[in-house]
Regions:
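Extended alpha-helical regions
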Residues: 215, 219, 225, 248-255
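Selective recognition of hydrophobic, aromatic-rich stretches within alpha-helical transmembrane segments
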Residues: 49, 53, 86-121, 162-194, ...
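Hydrophobic alpha-helical transmembrane segments
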Residues: 13, 22, 35, 47, ...
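Membrane-interface segments at transmembrane-helix boundaries
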Residues: 4-18, 56-76, 103-142, 187-206, ...
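N-terminal entry module detector
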Residues: 1-61
Length: 255
């Protein structure tokens, strides 16, 4: 499978997820609870973000005096660049707000997403059907919860560094891309965990399928430009990611 095919497959992951969930009552029910949580969080973010922008900006400026000086310089000396800087800054804020809400939803919805992915992989023939798979589901859910909490610590450290880098001229371009890749990997990680991939195998899968993750990251960024849309669509990304993972794995197994 060519790199361009992988890229397109990654780009259309959410639409694969929509089709899967909307055409299966069982998958729909598994996605419904975290989806309702996502809708609630999305509405809350949409309202709070646009009604408290001034307060949020004041807090940022008080916390980072050097940023205040930087913005005063840009706004005072080069008004056009200042406007561009402010626009990019708010894009950055929206992306990171969505990212942290995504982490919260992953933690809350981990048991449902684990079972959702497991059902899809069984349907695609990558997992053997098990009549009483409650123990496996419970084990996978707890393991994914622990992994998610561990990744939360790592990602919070990384996002703190990215937050500082974002105020560098190239940072406002690189940060959304990196955030997109981080979330793209996390969406596929449910499938990798169900297949019992080791850390080395997960890293190898990521590096050997960069075109697929690039398409998926781009789809995530597209959905992120409308506040709340990505959090509402998260079950579709995870379900579509599992289906795409199965498709790629089976295609590579036959070549």
């Amino acid at each position: 499978m060519s790199s361009s095919t992988h890229f397109v497959k990654g780009l259309f992951v959410p639409f694969r997820g929509i089709y899967l969930i909307m055409t299966s009552f069982q998958l729909f029910m598994l996605a419904l609870i975290p989806l309702l949580l996502a809708i609630g969080v999305g509405i809350f973010l949409l309202v709070s973000l646009w009604t408290n922008t001034a307060t949020f900006m004041e807090l940022i400026l008080e916390w980072l005096p050097w940023l205040h000086q930087l913005m005063q310089f840009r706004l005072g000396d080069i008004s056009l660049l200042g406007m561009i800087f402010q626009g990019l800054f708010w894009i950055f804020v929206i992306l990171f707000t969505i990212y942290f809400s995504y982490l919260a939803l992953i933690i809350i919805g981990a048991p449902f997403y684990s079972l959702l992915v497991d059902k899809i992989l069984v349907r695609r023939g990558l997992q053997p059907p098990v009549q009483n798979n409650f123990i496996r589901w419970l084990y996978t859910s707890l393991k994914m919860l622990i992994i998610t909490l561990f990744k939360l610590v790592i990602f919070m450290t990384a996002t703190g560094l990215l937050f500082i880098v974002s105020f560098w001229s190239l940072g406002v371009i690189l940060v959304p891309i990196l955030v997109g890749f981080m979330i793209a990997y996390d969406c596929i990680d449910f499938s990798l965990e169900c297949m019992n991939y080791s850390l080395r195998e997960r890293w190898n899968y990521f590096t050997s399928h960069l075109s697929f993750f690039s398409g998926l990251a781009l789809a995530i960024l597209f959905f992120s430009f409308i506040p709340g849309l990505f959090t509402i669509s998260l079950p579709f990304f995870i379900a579509g990611g599992a289906d795409a993972f199965a498709s790629i794995t089976q295609s590579e197994a036959t070549t």
